[in-house]
Amino acid sequence: MNDTGRRILLNCDMGESFGAWRMGDDVHSMPLVDQANLACGFHAGDPLTMRRAVELAVRHGVSIGAHPAYPDLSGFGRRSLACSAEEVHAMVLYQIGALDAFCRSLGTQVAYVKPHGALYNDLVGDDELLRAVLDACAAYRKGLPLMVLALADNGRELELADEADVPLLFEAFADRAYLPDGRLAPRRLGGAVHHDPQRIIEQALAIARGEAFPDYDGNPLRLTADSLCVHGDNPQSLAVLRRLRAALDSL
């Protein structure tokens, strides 16, 4: 349980294969999560991959999130691009609609939006970009939630979301190191991504219980989150997901 008394959810980025290139183990990971963030074609995912990922989520009763990104297939969406707010609004709306077409064809719908990679990180501290993404969510469907990074202080995000009339979901990461303000440690830093399964489990359980855990510098950090993410592109992702699912279910 998080400090609101609600059960914390478990999410994973999926549907990230592209053509002959394979990423992650969606078939075995999907039954272990509550929410699946599905790539929409800009950083990964092609139409067939998207359809299959939606089918898999529907089969296992998993909530589907659109995972829009900058148009950056070669960089897997992890490079910031010099896009205007108008461009970001359009590309996010485009990607939500693409994934939702597959959802609707299978009797479901996109339940939330979680930006990917560099776009996700760029929203932190950039009000113009955050407004563009919030407005895209609001334009697509009233009440469509946006998943954002849980920070030590999310006051600004809450203020802008309230102006746009968009619900927020706050996300924390089990397998990433954090800076003191709650931002993710950049991947270029050594130790920014946790690979030790025990450390991942310990950090996840601390967040789920509303307890402090060590930030990148070893100082205590406390975050309030609705959902925990484990990345599907780590070598030990499936084994960690299984252990984490069991640990969260025991709380």
Curated annotation (Swiss-Prot):
MF (Gene Ontology): 5-oxoprolinase (ATP-hydrolyzing) activity; ATP binding
Oligomeric and partner information: Forms a complex composed of PxpA, PxpB and PxpC.
Summary of the function given for this chain in its UniProt record: Catalyzes the cleavage of 5-oxoproline to form L-glutamate coupled to the hydrolysis of ATP to ADP and inorganic phosphate.
Organism of this sequence: Pseudomonas aeruginosa (strain ATCC 15692 / DSM 22644 / CIP 104116 / JCM 14847 / LMG 12228 / 1C / PRS 101 / PAO1)
SUPFAM superfamilies per the UniProt record, alphabetical: Glycoside hydrolase/deacetylase (SSF88713)
Family: Belongs to the LamB/PxpA family.
One example of a Gene Ontology biological process annotation: carbohydrate metabolic process
Pfam families: LamB_YcsF
Keyword field: ATP-binding, Hydrolase, Nucleotide-binding
Reactions catalysed according to its record: 5-oxo-L-proline + ATP + 2 H2O = L-glutamate + ADP + phosphate + H(+)
Catalytic activity, EC: 3.5.2.9
Protein name: 5-oxoprolinase subunit A 3
